[in-house]
């Protein structure tokens, strides 16, 4: 489950196909029990596909123990990814929503969803291997590399956002059509959490603090011990350029 409140979508996420609000409170999906939360650190800057820093929290993602560069359950709006399978492709949106595209043996270069409103994924050969392009009905295109990592967002009018990554796949830089960039900096190798420490934007630096919460489990003679190696890392504080620290 993704956004529970009739999502408006984002640069790399489609809105809810129904637009139905099933949320309550902060908000909680009454049907699935999933808690979804959106936080806007930097609203989209002016212009087509203007830079933004928007975080999405999804409790299903946190419960599954998915690793995140921000902290358990959180993703940036540019963190939509593609999971590649032998019989299907699966889009995992930044808000946690998932869209399945079945492979068609008769048309191996195209994969379709059961919902035509989700568009289709086309597969093409590129220098680094296969490249996957998610075509939205409205004309937007999302380009993923051979590992399923988002590398470009193309507007119908031709402007595009480029995403630069490390060899390991870490997002390092996001550049919008106006030439403005976000630069992502990560905690050092000696840190217990190798995730995002700062994001430098045209309006200043945003800093992110995380804290580990160790899980307990059965130890010798039935005693419970903390399992630091399985600790959940939670996002605890965000500091804005004006030194305004906000707890999440």
What do these predicted ranges mean?
Residues 1-116, 228, 243-248:
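Short secondary-structure "cap/edge" segments that initiate or terminate local elements
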Residues 53, 72, 83, 87-248:
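Extended charged/polar low-complexity repeat regions
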């Amino acid at each position: 489950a993704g956004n529970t409140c009739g999502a408006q979508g984002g640069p790399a996420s489609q809105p809810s196909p129904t637009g139905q609000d099933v949320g309550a409170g902060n908000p909680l999906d009454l049907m699935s029990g999933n808690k979804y939360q959106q936080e806007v650190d930097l609203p989209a800057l002016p212009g087509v596909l203007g830079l933004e820093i928007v975080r999405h929290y999804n409790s299903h993602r946190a419960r599954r123990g998915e690793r995140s560069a921000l902290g358990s359950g959180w993703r940036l709006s540019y963190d939509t990814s593609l999971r590649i399978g032998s019989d299907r492709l699966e889009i995992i949106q930044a808000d946690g929503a998932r869209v399945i595209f079945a492979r068609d043996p008769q048309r191996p270069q195209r994969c379709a969803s059961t919902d035509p409103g989700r568009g289709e994924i086309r597969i093409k050969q590129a220098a680094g291997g296969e490249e996957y392009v998610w075509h939205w009905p409205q004309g937007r295109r999302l380009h993923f590399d051979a590992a399923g990592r988002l590398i470009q967002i193309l507007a119908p009018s031709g402007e595009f956002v480029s995403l630069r990554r490390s060899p390991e796949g870490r997002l390092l830089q996001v550049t919008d059509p106006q030439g403005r960039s976000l630069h992502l900096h990560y905690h050092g190798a000696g840190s217990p959490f190798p995730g995002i420490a700062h994001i430098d934007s045209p309006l200043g630096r945003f800093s992110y603090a995380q804290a580990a919460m160790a899980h307990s489990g059965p130890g010798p003679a039935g005693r419970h011990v903390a399992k630091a190696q399985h600790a959940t890392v939670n996002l605890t504080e965000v500091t804005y350029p004006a030194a305004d620290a906000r707890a999440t």
